[in-house]
Amino acid sequence: HDALPICAGQVGAAASYLLSSTPGISDIVLVDVDPARAAGEAADIGHAAAFGTAARVQEGSYADLAGAAVVVITAGASLKPGQTRLELLQQNLRIVDHITEQVLRAAPDTILLFATNPVDVMPAIAVQRWGVAPGRAIGTGCTLDSIRFRDRLSHHLEVSPSSVHAYVLGEHGDSEVLLWSGAQVGGLPLLDFAQQSGRPIDAALQRTMAEDVRTAAYRIKAGKGVSNFGIGGCIARLVRAMVGDERSVFTVSTYLPELLGVQRTCVSLPHVIGRTGASTPYLPPLADDEATALRASAEVLAQTIAGGLQALEDRA
């Protein structure tokens, strides 16, 4: 199988729908605690896929995971209005820990792609608790935040998002760090391009844009109750990069023994994504304030990971 989303909820269904029309993806299996829901989603998505690539989409069980290239874990409670991703930890940790155990029994060599929040904690649990190699336990991390950053910049500058190279690092959440110092458009530093184009970006606008990116999910959920298509698109894009061995660069989250003096954390940094999962992360040059913010973000996640591991051990 190419990809097996675990959970046929809003995010899993959106990801599966997009994967069904992704070049190179021919086989998708949905696994859910509610088999009828998974079967219904699989049939509906399969009918849509028949218009294009005709990828095979079906409902299955953990036994069907054997040989899967990628297993995408989206199961868990969703973010409620006013709730932070880290506050979801206690609700989702036991669910994802149990799923991870079942997946590894059936497919010990698969790549685990986590989309369940808090998405930066789950890869660390897989590495520290289940011994998964860091490059094969991947969180979608700040992939979506980076896209939101580029989208916001592209609208302001009136250029295509594909011409904007800008990344968000750290936590997929409130402590994330927008990398202004390394952002470029057309080979020019972002702020130089903005100035020359007559659309300058001053400190006040930077703060506004950063807040827009950071709170995008909260606004979406306040309006429609769920954020699913953006993250579904990220999942599909990452799976495509893995299955196709693209070696494309994305800001995903992986477990790090040490970062900027912080031990045993898991944050988003640029990684090369291909058939074997995620490469060793790359730490880009940082301005002093960006380094300070990234260190603080890494510390928040290190403490959360330690607390999550302790909670699982206490329940054992």
Question: Positions of the model-derived regions?
Answer:
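N-terminal Rossmann-fold NAD(P) dinucleotide-binding loop
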Residues: G12-A13
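Rossmann-like NAD(P)(H) cofactor-binding subdomain of soluble oxidoreductases
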Residues: R85-D151
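Conserved S-adenosyl-L-methionine
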Residues: S21-D27, G131-P134
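Rossmann-like NAD(P)-binding element
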Residues: A50-I111
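Glycine-rich Rossmann-fold phosphate-binding loop(s) that bind the pyrophosphate
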Residues: A8-G9
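Conserved N-terminal Rossmann-fold NAD(P) cofactor-binding segment
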Residues: D27-A69, Q83, A302, A306-E313
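C-terminal substrate-binding/catalytic lobe of Rossmann-fold NAD(P)-dependent dehydrogenases
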Residues: W130-R136, D145-A316
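Short, small-residue-biased leader/transition segments that mark boundaries at the very start
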Residues: H1-L4
